[in-house]
Amino acid sequence: MIFHDITTIIRFAIRKNNADKIIFFIENLSHFRFIESIFDYFFKNNYDITVISLENPFGTRDYNNNNLSLVLLKDEKDKITTLKNLKGKLFITTTPSIGTPIFPKSQIIPKEDRPKYLYFFHSLVSPNEMYVKNSFKNFDYIFSPSDIITEQLNFLVSNKTEIFTTGYLLFNNIEVGNYSKDFDDKVLIAPTWGEKGVSQLMN
């Protein structure tokens, strides 16, 4: 199971770094589903969790625990200030480009109080094609969804980054569907995410 493999590696990272506080950076509700199973695991096991987000990432889900704190960022300035002053052991996110001016790492002293940074892919696109330069260079741990992406990542990270090929978490949710109706007179358009996804295809 993909989930089992990932939690095993994260538990190792927790022991290695003596982690007593886990931080999740989740941009919004649409990003939460990519690491929901990971979050649920730590939530149910009563880890000390801080979630940093641009909006409530849980939607209608009910998470109520004294060990969970939610930090909703007011604006870009608040985001940068918060990230620069983080204290914790592990920082888990699906957002690339950590360590850049728009997504900075913690700068607190002593350095031992700064978290290790873990990245989960929220898509299966090539890291060579869809990401800006240095999107992966500053992560400590990266969980790759495939062997091909792992091969590409090896040229995009620092020599300190550890890459684990674990698979794509959403594949744990695949269900067999029974679709028997054919639509010979229709075309399926599947644009990528973003406001201009459809308009770019139409033009």
Where do the PLM segments sit?
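N-terminal pre-catalytic "stem/leader" segment of glycosyltransferase-like enzymes
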Residues: 1-88
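A short, charged/proline- and glycine-enriched loop
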Residues: 14-22, 113-115, 181-186
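A structural signal for isolated positions on well-ordered beta-strands in alpha/beta enzyme cores
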Residues: 23, 48-51, 118, 141, ...
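Structural motif
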Residues: 25-29, 52-56, 94-97, 121-123, ...
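Short, charged/polar "capping" segments at the starts of alpha-helices
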Residues: 31-34, 56-63, 100-103, 150-153, ...
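Conserved catalytic-core segment of nucleotide-activated headgroup transferases in glycan assembly
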Residues: 31-46, 169-203
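Glycosyltransferases and closely related glycan-assembly transferases
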Residues: 43-44, 83-87, 101-116
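Active-site-proximal region of nucleotide-activated glycan assembly enzymes
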Residues: 66-77, 90-100, 110-173
